[in-house]
């Protein structure tokens, strides 16, 4: 998976956790870039109206110092309904969060405990509604060190 040399450390780490290999590139970027050859777009430092890249899995990142100051967490934007259902299971230990714990069957798949707490989600919705139509990118290749020489 192609990853810019200058990006946040968790990007190549996440690629490695999926079982893929990282190929670092000299891409100069601002706000967002694609993890080629996949339709995954890292938009961790961009949040502006109309930014969604059609037919992609566009990753947003939240932090108290970012454009949308929602504690810490993220979101994946996509128009792929099957992927949305998979993400919903994956974020909640492979379980359907609508089923009460005492009625819950075994997990449908191996998942993670990575859902956004309801209080943060509510704050995020509030901030989404208040967000400006256009925001300057809060990061790009100029903001990060070259991490291609790190041992992974």
What are these regions (language model features)?
Residues 1-50:
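PLP-dependent aminotransferase-like
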Residues 47-49, 57-152:
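Active-site region of PLP-dependent enzymes
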Residues 53:
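Nucleotide-sugar donor-binding and catalytic loop/hinge architecture
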